[in-house]
From Swiss-Prot:
UniProt KW keywords: Cytoplasm, Isomerase, Manganese, Metal-binding
Protein name in UniProt: Phosphopentomutase
EC numbers for this chain: 5.4.2.7
Zinc-finger is among the record's keywords: no
Cofactor: Mn(2+)
Organism of derivation: Idiomarina loihiensis (strain ATCC BAA-735 / DSM 15497 / L2-TR)
Pfam families assigned: Metalloenzyme
One GO MF term: manganese ion binding
Highest taxon of the lineage: Bacteria
Positions bound to Mn(2+) 1: D10, D337, H338
Residue ranges crossing the lipid bilayer per the database entry: none
GO term, biological process aspect, one: metabolic compound salvage
Length: 399
């Protein structure tokens, strides 16, 4: 029996999706634009292992051209690009669709840039959480709003409420002055109160520091998601006696549904070390599922092109270590959940095609084309683990 190791490079899109114009994202290309930026600055992106596994070819399949500094090479894995069927370009939609369940309904959104949340909801939150007030109530970058309101938050003990183009209600609070457990309790109550609004996630955003220029978000972020609308590959594997090891924020994204073991870790090195530890002990018939969040939160949303490039190069250096821990029957999958082009306007996600790079001793190298849904990965995993087929998605041929 096989094991699958799925690493989600959160936000690593490889070219604008066919419907990107509906999202204002036509022309977005996270990988391509990072490569172009580094090439123009005389420091071409160095990703030999990702290239070996088919990244450059998947990008060419997605866009019709090689990224700057990349060219045709012999690949040692199966590669494809995939479009998203789900209605949104958010984290839960992307991950659920990867596991076979596209989101065909429309999420609720708080669309007003200022005074974003309904007064009735805010009043309910203050009462239920025994709060005297709040700050924010707007669309904002998570780091910028700390600079603007962090000191006032410490003085007042009012939590900071904010949102974005995603279906989210985010709450920032100081770990010491407000309290981490108190923040989690507030988020749990808000999660219950916003059910009528069909919001995908409430996110706890704890931070530390004592003034505007040194506030820093911590690794104690917690996402409060709704359950996927249907059973995912995770459920099917568990039901058949298999094991799902969720690393990083994966368990939060699926609201714990279908997760056998949740491993908390942070930072690229910490998350990949946790993945290696899981690979050492995981039995056959196990899915090891890791989200590498920093690509998105630290570099994509913050439009930090250099930081994103460095993180990609660091990840690339990890790949031989991951591969050396694989058994002969293991399948490694490198993919993403949406784009977040650091060269793009604004701070939000971008609607993009994603890479699907599959490798292992039993995987035949080559082009698997342009896929019509992220759910093709879920169907592929069903076939790998000999599970009942998902309703959507077409399995990728591995050999």
């Amino acid at each position: 029996m096989s094991r699958a190791i799925v690493l989600v490079l959160d936000s690593f899109g490889i070219g604008s999706a066919p419907d990107a114009d509906k999202f204002g994202d036509e022309g977005a290309d996270t990988f391509g634009h990072i490569a172009e930026y580094r090439y123009q600055h005389g420091q071409p992106l160095q990703l030999p292992n990702l290239t070996r596994l088919g990244l450059a070819e998947a990008h060419k399949e997605a866009t019709g051209t090689y990224a700057k500094g990349f060219h045709e090479v012999e690949t040692h894995g199966a590669y494809a690009c995939a479009a998203e069927l789900s209605s949104g370009k958010d984290t839960p939609s992307g991950h659920w669709e990867l596991m076979g369940v596209p989101v065909h309904f429309e999420w609720g959104y708080f669309q007003d840039k200022e005074n974003s949340f309904p007064n009735e909801l805010l009043a309910q939150i203050l009462k239920a959480c025994e709060l005297d007030g709040y700050l924010g109530n707007c669309h904002a970058s998570g780091t910028e709003i700390l600079k603007q309101l962090g000191e006032q938050h410490i003085r007042s003990s009012y939590p900071i409420f904010y949102t974005s183009a995603d279906s989210v209600f985010q709450i920032a609070a100081h770990e010491e002055h407000f309290g981490l457990e108190r923040l989690y309790q507030v988020c749990e109550k808000v999660r219950a109160l916003i059910e009528p609004y069909n919001i995908g996630r409430v996110i706890a955003r704890p931070f530390v520091g004592d003034k505007a220029d040194n506030f820093e978000r911590t690794a104690n972020r917690k996402d409060y998601s709704v359950l996927p609308p249907k059973p995912t590959v995770l459920d099917k594997l568990q039901n058949k006696g298999g094991k799902v090891i969720a690393i990083g924020k994966i368990s939060d994204i699926f609201a714990g549904q279908g997760v056998s073991e949740s491993v908390k870790a942070s930072g690229l090195n910490g998350l990949l070390t946790a993945t290696l530890n899981a690979m050492e002990k995981a039995p056959e018939n196990t899915l090891i599922f890791t989200n590498l969040v920093d690509f998105d939160t630290l570099y994509g949303h913050r439009r930090d092109i250099d930081g994103y490039a460095r993180e990609l190069e660091t990840f690339d250096q990890w790949l031989p270590v991951i591969e050396s821990a694989m058994t002969p029957d293991d399948v490694l999958v490198l993919t993403a959940d949406h784009g977040c082009d650091p060269t793009w306007q604004g701070t939000d996600h971008t609607r993009e095609l994603i890479p699907l790079l599959l490798s292992g001793q039993n995987v035949q190298a080559g082009n698997r084309g342009k896929r019509h849904s992220f759910a093709d990965l879920g169907q592929t995993l069903c076939r790998l683990f000999d599970l009942p087929a998902m309703e959507e998605g077409k399995a990728i041929k591995l050999s």
